[in-house]
Structures are given as structure tokens and as C-alpha cells.
Amino acid sequence: HEIFVEESGNPEGQPILFLHGGPGGGTGAKQRRFFDPSYYRIILFDQRGCGKSKPLGGTLKNTTDNLVNDIELIRKELNINKWIIFGGSWGSTLALAYAIKHPKFVLGLVLRGIFLSRKHELEWFLKDVDIFFPELHNNLLNHIPNTSKKNLLEKYTELVFSNNKDQAYQAAIAWNKFEGSILKLLSPSTSIEANEVDNEFELARAKVQLHYINNNCFVDGEDILEKSKILKDKPITII
């Protein structure tokens, strides 16, 4: 894997690491807006298989432990003594996993839109979200014939990882549109038109996310909560 890392802001400022969501997301200019560039040394990176990292959509040797090790390697390569970790959604899971393993290098945490990859959270995402988004969930089910709540994950995994690129692209786009739409209580965005879609990026995003979900994100969310007690003296902001 080749990991894309970006620095901006004040080179002498307070180091802060942004961890993107997904799994399968990526970073971009908008993530820099969370931070005052005159104060912070801003570090963004695309996790394995994501964004500008290579190979795009790669799932081999792509686990939470691998990502935690990547974060620590980035810290060492950038000669950072201690930093603040900022993570949202899946990034909050990854932030805690890193902080638990390397607490002495963490000044504090900012966690937003918390998702801890616990079994009931994944079950809600796959099966119970139709309570709030019945139409979106039905659209996801109806995209592939003979799909139900019970086999939703299996069906989409099969298609997204299939050798039929056209079917894989369409399944990935449907999956990503659903996942992106349920992250907010606002009306679903209509900004993604067919001619704006990057098929390879959409496929990579879905591949990485399904790879993680099929493996419970390679973590025990309850264990993370229990082990996070060692961070009791760290300043943690939850949004």
C-alpha cells in the first residue's frame, strides 16, 4: 500500500490528525475547514484503499490494526511528538483504537458523529434503518432482485466484488448513495448526477466498506469502550 498524506496550516503549529469516515471514504479540501490554519499543523491521510492511496479499493492487508500502524508510522515520519486526533463516524472508532494502543502520543481526542462498530450498530445500519428511511432502504433492496434484509450484505458484497464491472459499478453506486443519504436527517442530496460519478472511486469506496462490515470492522466495539477507560485523563470532546 502507498498511503497519501497531506500537510497544511502552520508548520510550527499544534499537530492535529484528521481521520476520515467510511470505512472507504477519503479526504479532501473541505476537511481542512475544521481547523484554524494559523494555529494547527493539519495532517490528513487517505486510509488504505481510499482516495489517493494506492491501490484504490485494495482490501488485502487492510484491517483496523493495519490502519493504526499506518497512523503511528505517519507520526514517526513527520517527527511529531504528540498530536490531537480528530475522527468522525468510522474515524471515531479508528481514533479510539489508535489512542488505546498509543496513548502516550495523544494529547486529546475530538470525536464527532460517533460510530463504534458494535454489532448492534452494524445491525441497525443494515436492517433497522428503514424505520427512519423506508424509501431509501426499499430502493437499496429493490436494486438487486430477491434481496431482503437477511441477505442484503451478502448480495451487495457478491455484486460489488464480481468480475462483471457494469454490475459492480451500479451496485457500488446504489450502496454508496444509500449510505451517504442516511448519514443526515436532511433531504437526500441530488447533487450526484450520473455524469458526475467516478465509477472507480465509487467501486473502491463500496469494496472497502463492505470488506470492513463483513469483518465487523476488525474490532470489538464493546472492547474498545472498555479499554477506552485508560484515556480517562485525556481531554476528549464529543460532538
Write out the residue ranges for each language-model feature.
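Conserved HGGG/HGGXW glycine-rich cap/lid loop of the alpha/beta-hydrolase fold
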Residues: E2-P55
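Catalytic nucleophile-loop/oxyanion-hole region of alpha/beta-hydrolase
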Residues: P55-V68, H120-V129
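Conserved acidic catalytic loop of the alpha/beta-hydrolase fold
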Residues: D65-I84
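Short beta-strand immediately N-terminal to the catalytic nucleophile in serine-hydrolase-like folds
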Residues: I85-G87, R112, I239
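Short glycine-enriched nucleophile-adjacent loop
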Residues: S92-P103, L109
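A catalytic-pocket lid/entrance helix-loop region that shapes and gates access to the active site
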Residues: K104-Y156
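Active-site nucleophile elbow and catalytic-triad environment of alpha/beta-hydrolase enzymes
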Residues: H211-S228
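Short beta-strand/loop motif that positions the catalytic acidic residue
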Residues: L231-K232, T237-I239
